[in-house]
């Protein structure tokens, strides 16, 4: 919540579900792990339905998730949202971050353009040149959260707005470049003070933090276009 959901503070109302999260080792247990995942997901689905009935009040919806939450959010699409078109039409954006999500979610595609809506955004961040031992392929959807494109050249360092630190300060703008490669987001850092604390291969815990202000500003721009479209119509 502190470093991820708060990217939307002041731009949207934020509702976070309380759920019985599966332990990380449950992902390796094909029996009890799957049962625990189903329990966790059902908590998410019930919380979302409660939100719809008590808090939504006809407003548009943005779904934002990370890691295990992304697995549950993807299942929420396939098991609930895609079966309820009137609710699906309210979902302006989905941030499905930190887990592999394939490009083909029926009737809800990956975003291609910095101002697209009614689509999902996804990325998993690694150091440039690193391949994880688990899934990577061109069939996995990835959006570059600096230039908001799904492919093409690496983003410019000048386009990076900074990194959100644990003290809630944004530091080191223009310090990284990102490029999409085989279902991964590869990042390269420019030299800056304390850079060594960022020297790792897997940036899973910082999937939001590394691009926090880029995410916030882009979200504002997408919603600004929505409001302008509504005024025009």
Predicted regions and their residues:
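Helix-loop module immediately N-terminal to the HCX5R catalytic loop
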Residues: 28-59
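Gly/Ala-rich beta-loop-alpha elbow adjacent to hydrolase catalytic centers
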Residues: 65-73
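Short, hydrophobic alpha-helix immediately C-terminal to the catalytic nucleophile
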Residues: 74-78
């Amino acid at each position: 919540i502190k470093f991820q959901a708060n990217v939307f503070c002041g731009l949207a109302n934020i509702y976070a579900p309380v759920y019985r999260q599966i332990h990380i080792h449950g992902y390796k247990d094909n029996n009890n792990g799957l049962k625990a995942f189903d329990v966790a997901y059902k908590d998410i689905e019930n919380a979302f339905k409660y939100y719809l009935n008590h808090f939504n009040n006809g407003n548009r919806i943005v779904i934002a998730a990370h890691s295990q939450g992304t697995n549950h959010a993807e299942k929420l699409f396939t098991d609930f949202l895609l079966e309820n078109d009137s609710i699906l039409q309210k979902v302006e954006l989905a941030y499905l971050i930190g887990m592999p999500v394939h490009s083909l979610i029926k009737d809800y595609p990956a975003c291609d353009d910095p101002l697209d809506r009614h689509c999902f955004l996804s990325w998993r961040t690694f150091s440039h040149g690193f391949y994880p031992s688990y899934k990577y392929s061109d069939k996995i959807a990835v959006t570059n959260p600096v230039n908001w494109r799904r492919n093409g050249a690496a983003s410019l360092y000048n386009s990076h707005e900074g990194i959100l630190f644990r003290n809630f300060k944004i530091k080191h703008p223009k310090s990284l470049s990102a490029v999409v490669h085989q279902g991964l987001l590869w990042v390269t850092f420019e030299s800056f003070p304390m850079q060594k604390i960022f020297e790792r291969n897997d940036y899973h815990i910082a999937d939001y933090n590394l691009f926090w202000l880029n995410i916030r500003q882009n979200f504002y721009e997408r919603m600004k276009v929505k409001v302008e479209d509504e005024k025009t119509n």
